[in-house]
Amino acid sequence: GTPCKCHGYIGVYWFMLAGCPDGYGYNLSCPYFLGICCVKK
């Protein structure tokens, strides 16, 4: 996915998702335009 920033971390942008997908170990997220930014801290 596309890199994105969330609370000072670099995360992955997921298009057209309301929440981060399970199984990737994400524990931080930020709402983004038409999607969400998910971060593994």
Swiss-Prot record:
Sorted UniProt keywords: Disulfide bond, Ion channel impairing toxin, Nematocyst, Proton-gated sodium channel impairing toxin, Secreted, Toxin
Disulfide bond recorded as keyword: yes
Pfam assignment, any one: Defensin_4
SUPFAM superfamilies in UniProt: Defensin-like
GO molecular function, one term: toxin activity
Cystine pairs: 4-37, 6-30, 20-38
Subcellular localization, as worded in the UniProt entry: Secreted; Nematocyst
GO cellular component: extracellular region; nematocyst
Similarity comment: family membership: Belongs to the sea anemone type 3 (BDS) potassium channel toxin family.
Record's function text: Weakly and reversibly inhibits rat homomeric ASIC1 (isoform ASIC1a) (IC(50)=4.95 uM), and ASIC3 (IC(50)=17 uM). ASIC1a current inhibition and ASIC3 transient current inhibition are not complete, and reach a maximum of 70% inhibition and 80%, respectively.
Note: A synonymy between H.magnifica and R.crispa is controversial.
Name under which the protein is recorded: Pi-stichotoxin-Hcr5c
Organism: Radianthus crispa (Leathery sea anemone)
